[in-house]
Amino acid sequence: MATIHVDGKTLEVDGADNLLQACLSLGLDIPYFCWHPALGSVGACRQCAVKQYTDENDKRGRLVMSCMTPATDNTWISIEDEEAKQFRASVVEWLMTNHPHDCPVCEEGGHCHLQDMTVMTGHNERRYRFTKRTHQNQELGPFIAHEMNRCIACYRCVRYYKDYAGGTDLGVYGAHDNVYFGRVEDGVLESEFSGNLTEVCPTGVFTDKTHSERYNRKWDMQFAPSICHGCSSGCNISPGERYGEIRRIENRYNGSVNHYFLCDRGRFGYGYVNREDRPRQPLLVLSKQKLSLDGALDQAAALLKERKVVGIGSPRASLESNFALRELVGEGNFYSGINEGELDRLRLILQVMQEGPLPVPSIRDIEDHDAVFVLGEDLTQTAARIALALRQSVKGKAVEMAADMKVQPWLDAAVKNIAQHAQNPLFIASVSATRLDDVAEETVHAAPDDLARLGFAVAHAIDPSAPSVADLDPQAQAFAQRITDALLAAKRPLVVSGNSLGNKALIEAAANIAKALKQREKNGSISLVVGEANSLGLALFGGDSVEAALERLTSGQADAVVVLENDLYRRTDAARVDAALAAAKVVIVADHQQTATTAKAHLVLPAASFAEGDGTLVSQEGRAQRFFQVFDPTYYDARNMVREGWRWLHAIHSTLQGKRVDWTQLDHVTEAVAEAKPILAGIRDAAPAASFRIKGLKLAREPHRYSGRTAMRANISVHEPRTPQDIDSAFAFSMEGYSGSQEDRQQIPFAWSPGWNSPQAWNKFQDEVGGHLRAGDPGVRLIEPKGEGLDWFQAVPVPFSAKADSWKVVPLYHLFGSEENSSRAAPIQQRIPETYVALSKEDADRLGVNDGATLGFQLKGQALRLPLRIDEQLGAGLIGLPVGFAGIPAAIAGCSVEGLQEAAQ
């Protein structure tokens, strides 16, 4: 700690910070542009000037840039010094000489950092009366709009995009006051994290194009704290709604998880919530009859009465909804909705997390590891936010080298110059090239079984008591030794693996490496990636596979099925699903999307998406997190009967039993889950109860400037209805409630503080800028390792051997296209590649086919015709297929393809 003196006040700060960060952490306001908590200091904008004095007797002082000045002990500064204030105002004024006068039509207006800083400096009159510099804008794809004339040349965009996120197609061109930030030519921004430019940019150069198409100001949107459902990472988001539509998604700061950044799937994949073809009223499918609320409950109860019912849950539904289904059908009749192979691997992952020797790190904690081995995962496609964290972990070497030279880590340019190209080691073993390969020390591409053999070899090299690998070729053995040396040399090694390749041996090999590291007394971690937002929650919750449920229907052991938020055709073979649904006398589906399964239902119940309901998810870290309802859809249309899955299912259960509904609010069902499943007892603490208040007030979902509420339904009726009442949470569907930053709270719908309207307002909610929220980061970890309860896994697979007339399927994942719901969003659909089949160059040459040729083959009894994509990194004997794409069967990992040949045109 250090003592600094600011305008006559003596304050305690972290001496490792710069003055700007230290003062912001104290709640003091200093305007800035180029500095960002995640990017460090470069001193480019000169906006954060303060007056520094030699000591208490110095009356003259000198101007310094606070972002470039360390907060050393006994520093004397003034923020309110008149010369410093005039200097800061002059900086804003000359930045404004070329900035257009377009705030009323700029999408950034109302959450613009430039607006905030201009007001903060007191600049309110333009004296420049001459021609402004202008630029040609670029077309950057479906996610981001480009308006270069608004640029103030703070360099944040390229520092984030190139230096932080590893992008290569955005740069800065030109010189002096005529610089241009963009691509060499028009084209889609290639980075999977490009959407963060909309929050990193302090002006309106890069704006959310998906929001611009249905635009409204930040102060006119209703927000709620939510969790991204796009993968298992558990990123915190703030969805904004107007007129019953989600208009945009902003990053919600969580110092342990996503920090300041999201991936593009999570930011732009919300369009499925707004689709016109969503179920919004209960429907008898055969007669196409829409039902009332009571009619739907009576119909469901009549259909299920005296039936042998099974329930199929879902890893994309909340714990509460899955529990309500289990209560409806009985514990022995509840099935997880996950295919048997994936469920088996999930149980193994859970065993490793619970009984293994090493902890699972948070995403933020991943950045602090100094040697990483990724085994079998293409993380940018399966858990993109973890991939971004790994990009930061390799930069730890630069910080370490800078510390040895007494250079502070926030001096961004100096740290980079010291390190040059030195990085912490990252090793990647995958079936094909990944988007992280550019920062990896070494990569290897091989069949899943061979990757697992490499992992087992690494474990054995770390600790010879681990099972050895027979017949490992010398090249692989040498590679395993290099990985071993790096992991043992590290202070905090990390091994990352997961479920995506459908190979159990990969997870077992990763677990052996973790055990071996613990045996060598390394302070390491293990991170295991799972498929969906609540996959780990379902593994904790229990329930057999979807195939087991279908078998009960096909065999006649059950004659009715209730399916919760699950398209069974994406889980297992279509023929098996067809047979089971045909055998069932009653099929009831509760979902928020039209799917192949809802088309086969007798009764469809409109379930809530994440935007219309509350619930709890468990991320791949084992962190239980609550998402909250953003808006009440019935406010805009009384015919809309969308309800949370747990509400529908509990109401049906109560109707069947002829009793009143017991669970009238979320806290009731959450408490019931916690009591029924002791391992899930911690979900009580995932968020405050509905009774939580600050100064006697509920928490406001809407900014206090929210306008038009009394006119929003005037086209329906001039009589204004009562504001929807939220009995499930501590939030109000109103601007009336607490929305400030002074009182500590974890669940924050939107970031706003007086004078701070942009995303930089998160500074006001943190214990220190870039640290954790003052009230603690949202969520609660449910799983901690027990130590030495896990034995060595012994089943080392045999080497993969390519065959002349048969190919082994490896699943290939795409950030845009492999996840079910985001793929329904129009902007995401523009980024989904055409369905393809991938072969190695060796196999393509042997078959005599070229890139783009149409290949025909049989897979799981289904005939496919797909264009060929030659993959130089794919091994011979392997055939790659994109997961989740149209026409690709479910559960393809490890299947065999035969009869592969060029199809007749």
UniProtKB/Swiss-Prot annotation:
GO terms for cellular component: membrane. [4Fe-4S] cluster 3 binds at residues 228, 231, 235, 263. Its EC number is 7.1.1.-. GO terms for biological process: ATP synthesis coupled electron transport; respiratory electron transport chain. Binds 1 [2Fe-2S] cluster per subunit. Residues 221-277 form the 4Fe-4S Mo/W bis-MGD-type domain. [2Fe-2S] cluster binds at residues 34, 45, 48, 67. [4Fe-4S] cluster 1 binds at residues 99, 103, 106, 112. Keywords: 2Fe-2S, 4Fe-4S, Iron, Iron-sulfur, Metal-binding, NAD, Quinone, Translocase, Ubiquinone. One of its GO terms (molecular function) is 2 iron, 2 sulfur cluster binding. Belongs to the complex I 75 kDa subunit family. This is NADH-quinone oxidoreductase subunit G.
